[in-house]
């Protein structure tokens, strides 16, 4: 099944999502847009199993990483974004 992983510019570069991913889909890459100088990236999205552990690990009020399963459309699920 094909999943889409979106990383938003609200990422604070904390690496929580990267450490939470059981299949190493995510990695940190250099980015000057935040204090930490890095942002999450999803270069191996084909390995995403849709567990959404990255979403759960994200400490920001506005989830910086979102996983959309297959044909799932953008929906709030009670979360601000």
From Swiss-Prot:
Membrane topology: Peripheral membrane protein
Cofactor: [4Fe-4S] cluster
UniProt cross-references to Gene3D superfamilies, sorted A to Z: 3.30.70.20
EC main group: oxidoreductase
Keywords on record: 4Fe-4S, Chloroplast, Electron transport, Iron, Iron-sulfur, Membrane, Metal-binding, Oxidoreductase, Photosynthesis, Photosystem I, Plastid, Repeat, Thylakoid, Transport
SUPFAM superfamilies: 4Fe-4S ferredoxins
Annotated cofactor note: Binds 2 [4Fe-4S] clusters. Cluster 2 is most probably the spectroscopically characterized electron acceptor FA and cluster 1 is most probably FB.
Disulfide bonds: none
InterPro entries listed in its UniProt record: 4Fe4S_Fe-S-bd, 4Fe4S_Fe_S_CS, PSI_iron-sulfur_center, PSI_PsaC
GO biological process: photosynthetic electron transport in photosystem I
Location(s) in or outside the cell: Plastid, Chloroplast thylakoid membrane
EC number: 1.97.1.12
Pfam families: Fer4_7
Protein name: Photosystem I iron-sulfur center
Chemical reaction(s) catalysed: reduced [plastocyanin] + hnu + oxidized [2Fe-2S]-[ferredoxin] = oxidized [plastocyanin] + reduced [2Fe-2S]-[ferredoxin]
Biological function: Apoprotein for the two 4Fe-4S centers FA and FB of photosystem I (PSI); essential for photochemical activity. FB is the terminal electron acceptor of PSI, donating electrons to ferredoxin. The C-terminus interacts with PsaA/B/D and helps assemble the protein into the PSI complex. Required for binding of PsaD and PsaE to PSI. PSI is a plastocyanin/cytochrome c6-ferredoxin oxidoreductase, converting photonic excitation into a charge separation, which transfers an electron from the donor P700 chlorophyll pair to the spectroscopically characterized acceptors A0, A1, FX, FA and FB in turn.
């Amino acid at each position: 099944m094909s999943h889409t992983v979106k990383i938003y510019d609200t990422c604070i570069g904390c690496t929580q999502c990267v450490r939470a991913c059981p299949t190493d889909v995510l990695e940190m890459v250099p980015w000057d847009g935040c204090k930490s100088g890095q942002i999450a990236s999803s270069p191996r999205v084909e390995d995403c199993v849709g567990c959404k552990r990255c979403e759960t690990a994200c400490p920001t009020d506005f989830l910086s990483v979102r996983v959309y399963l297959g044909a799932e459309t953008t929906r709030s699920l009670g979360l601000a974004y």
